[in-house]
Amino acid sequence: MTGFTPDAPVLHEIKNHSEALAQAEAGVAAMAAARNNRWYPKFHIASNGGWINDPNGLCFYKGRWHVFYQLHPYGTQWGPMHWGHVSSNDMLNWKREPIMFAPTLEEEKDGVFSGSAVIGDDGELKFYYTGHRWANGIDNTGGDWQVQMLAEPDNDELTSATKRGMIIDCPLDKVDHHYRDPKVWKTGDKWYMTFGVSSAEKRGQMWLFSSDDMVRWTYERVLFEHPDPNVFMLECPDFFPIKNAEGNEKWVIGFSAMGTKASGFMNRNISNAGYMIGTWTPGEAFQPETEFRLWDCGHNYYAPQSFNDGERQIVYGWMSPFVEPIPMQNDGWCGNLTLPREITLGADGDLHTAPVAEMDGLRENTTDFGTISLGVNGEQTIADDAEAVEIEMTIDLNASTAERAGLKIHATEDGAYTYVAFDDQIGRVVIDRQAAAQGDRGYRTAPLSAEELASGELKLRVFVDRGCVEVYVNDGRQAMSSFSYASEGPRAIKLVAESGTLEIKSLKLHTMKSIGLE
């Protein structure tokens, strides 16, 4: 295909960017002034006010970590997308930066959609993102018209940027509207770009482009087509090499699949983010060697983006409130990101994702409970009122007889709680929200391998923030992220055993510091 990659960027300004950014800042500030903090996170990244979704433009640049994110600054529902921005020099203490992008060009007049950041050969950063317009010029009833855009920062602090314009147009006869979320990397002496596409036949694909100068791009081929004909779009694609401890390299293709059907424990969310591991030769199609696997098995995880800081592959995900009711929309804000996770390729041939080592620096006070034994249907309160904590615990599977055992978090006086447990009958870790007083309910499960079950112990790291929980199983072999809307009053954490006994080999509870965004 040719004719849709211009020789030079194309742009048509329809609004003043500085004025649009000032209006967006005022919109966020108005909602922040009236924000209810009952579920607002203490150690997760969220906007000061308004709606957020996908993490964007993740990078470590000139000594600072930068996290951008999709932002609607005028409401707590999805709306015209901007790019919010926070930065940190240590991943522990974050500061709010000016909003980076507002939709001001004809090519993006209905939204500055998701994209990535990459450092060029000259050491300077470039932003690639999707410009979004409604195809009928009015609303979503006529579908999308989406193109790929380029911008460059004005300073090393990344507090503002200059939009260069459209670099890849959309061949409308080859695409069923969806055409977005560019990811750029270098292999050998060429730059490559991929993004998600819904083909004219409504098949979810990732297209591959190449460039010598990061500005002029040439279409190469379809990098990957999802084998499931129900999947019509691959949002927020990711693509990166990774080596195991022995130095053997694989390629990972990640995407958020739209159209997957639930089957048993798999794909229970409206859309599901996952990956495949395989091989890739530049210019060729990706060759998967594994089935589709979920990045995260919780209720609320979507649109992850990873980046390499020179030593580690780090990923953030969006804790996505897809299913109504969404109580936090009444509080002046909606949505937060997960903790940053390091991706590693384990000896088992699968990816592991665990909180980056820096997260240990958020711990303030630690209570070491040592070993704990609970009798049949036993219960022990380990925190009377836990606003923001991390729990490390190891369950002795061989010595425990409980059918389910674990932690009731956000346990309030009205009887509401969220349950993080090991279910012996199904051999899985569960987040169960059946006792939640507010928000969506249901449960999600993370599988344990036969090897893990046979090991005789289960290690859990449970991060509890004001309105969400993240669970890491056996050093990151599985991860789970879910919202948990606590009722009013003290929020206890209780260790429980159901229909049997529980033996805990070790349990520590750490209170967590704020990351400075409250």
Would you name each region that the model predicts?
Residues G3-F4, E25-M31, E246, T279-E518:
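Beta-rich accessory regions
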Residues T2-D181, K186-L234, K243-C297, R312, ...:
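Beta-rich carbohydrate-recognition and catalytic domains
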